[in-house]
């Protein structure tokens, strides 16, 4: 009889835990919950996902960079890097050690038209 009680106690100590579920199932459930929580903030971060509009403290007030969208900034940076890597534009070194790089490029027409409208509107508002 005493042997039966000890074997029953062992069974109880190795028995499933937490509402009758085995430990490995609970671990899997916990893993799934953690995984879903990692994915949920993506929807919650939609507000944060929109990048903050950058400011250009060193740029003049009438600098076009103040009016560029994220896409236009990206296009400009890509164009500048491509031009530099392919040898377009003019790169020079002054006697004081300053490096200068100057290049001209075109954005797609839709972006150019939008920028012309935005800059002409802000220029006319500044004149008033």
Swiss-Prot record:
GO terms for molecular function: RNA binding. The keyword Ribonucleoprotein applies. InterPro entries: Arte_nucleocap, Nucleocapsid_C. SUPFAM superfamilies: Nucleocapsid protein dimerization domain. It is found in: Virion. It holds the Pfam family Arteri_nucleo. One of its GO terms (cellular component) is ribonucleoprotein complex. It comes from the Viruses. Keywords: Ribonucleoprotein, RNA-binding, Viral nucleoprotein, Virion. Residues 1-60 are annotated as: Disordered. Its main location: virion. Belongs to the arteriviridae nucleocapsid family. This is Nucleoprotein. It comes from Porcine reproductive and respiratory syndrome virus (isolate Pig/United States/SD 01-08/2001) (PRRSV).
């Amino acid at each position: 009889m005493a042997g039966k009680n000890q074997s029953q106690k062992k069974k109880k100590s190795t028995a499933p835990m937490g509402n009758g579920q085995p430990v490995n199932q609970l671990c899997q459930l916990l893993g799934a919950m953690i995984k879903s929580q990692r994915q949920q903030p993506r929807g919650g971060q939609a507000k944060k996902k929109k990048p903050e509009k950058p400011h250009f403290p060193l740029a003049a007030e009438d600098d076009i960079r103040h009016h560029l969208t994220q896409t236009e900034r990206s296009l400009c940076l890509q164009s500048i890097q491509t031009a530099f890597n392919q040898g377009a534009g003019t790169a020079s070194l002054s006697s004081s050690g300053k490096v200068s790089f100057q290049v001209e490029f075109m954005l797609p027409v839709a972006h150019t038209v939008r920028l012309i409208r935005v800059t002409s509107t802000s220029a006319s508002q500044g004149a008033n």
